Amino acid sequence: MESPAPGARCPVQEQRARWERKRACTARELLETERRYQEQLGLVATYFVAILRAKGTLRPPERQALFGPWELIYGASQELLPYLEGGRWGQGLEGFCNHLELYTQFAANVERSRTILQEQLKKNKHFRRFVRLQEGRPEFGGLQLQDLLPLPLQRLQQYENLAVALAENTGPNSPEHKQLTRAAQLISETAQRVHTIGQKQKNEQHLQRIQALLSGRQAKGLISGRWFLRQGWLLVVPPRGEPRPRMFFLFSDALLMAKPRPPLHLLQSGTFACRALYPMGECQLHRVFGHSGGPCGGLLSLSFPHEKLLLMSTDQEELSHWYHSLTLAISSQKN
């Protein structure tokens, strides 16, 4: 049996060396980005939060709504950084996980913060002047307050990626392996909760926008609590006569058909009148034509217990998107 050549490395050693290189690279990236993150957190905490508190330019409720738990997040970074600088990744991230709830609170406040910022910049001239002065400081490097406010949520995604990479490239026999694995799991769970909060906020924005487009008494509260999927114009093909354009709003549980108000309507020009609300749990969907990807559009058939809809589009790609979205809505209700 031949012995390995002198200087040759076995596959296990090579794998360990790759892990160690990736671990060192990830650890360096975590440290360098944490320093920059803490610096930017400090800019907002020092030049905005602290000075606004001292000057009283904003009332306490408005200041709290604008910045949320910013100073506590800054403090959590100040606790973490010395551990990273000392190479104690597992211990540092394990302790940092005690502060993850701050990121959930911050995410829940994002839309309120954005609204307060826009309102105060518009109506509070003292605040507007203060913001311009602070943003003009050389320390900000041209960054505006609105650029810095999303930082914690962006950083949480980086924490997740880096913590997972550190855990994956730390050997199971390392004393830090258990700490890093647990930290990566907790950070990933928090990132998922934050993502869910963001999705709900976007959906609420869609619902508010759509509600503003719908007019008439029967439209009030019609879409409250629903999950928005898609909207757009489609042609309704009647049994006799010409196809009629209608605006459709698709939610996870219902399809709303609306008719545009006349352009010369005194009070409701530019809005839509609700014509029907179809339950997706009772829908049977078929693609009549438009399977081939040709240029001539397509036709969808939607059957409900007491009505059948034929929906047409001259844009086959658009119709394919509708078919996919309708299929998702139907399956979500039947599951």
From Swiss-Prot:
Pfam families noted in UniProt: RhoGEF
UniProt keyword annotations, A-Z: Cell membrane, Guanine-nucleotide releasing factor, Membrane
Entry's localization field: Cell membrane
Sample GO molecular function, one term: guanyl-nucleotide exchange factor activity
GO biological process: positive regulation of cell migration
Domain PH intervals: 227-331
Domain called DH: residue spans: 22-197
InterPro entries hit by this protein: ARHGEF39 (IPR042987), DBL_dom_sf (IPR035899), DH_dom (IPR000219), PH-like_dom_sf (IPR011993), PH_domain (IPR001849)
GO CC list: plasma membrane
Domain of life assignment: Eukaryota
PANTHER family per the UniProt record, alphabetical: RHO GUANINE NUCLEOTIDE EXCHANGE FACTOR 39
The protein's role, per its UniProt record: Promotes cell proliferation.
Name of the protein: Rho guanine nucleotide exchange factor 39
Natural source organism: Bos taurus (Bovine)
Gene: ARHGEF39
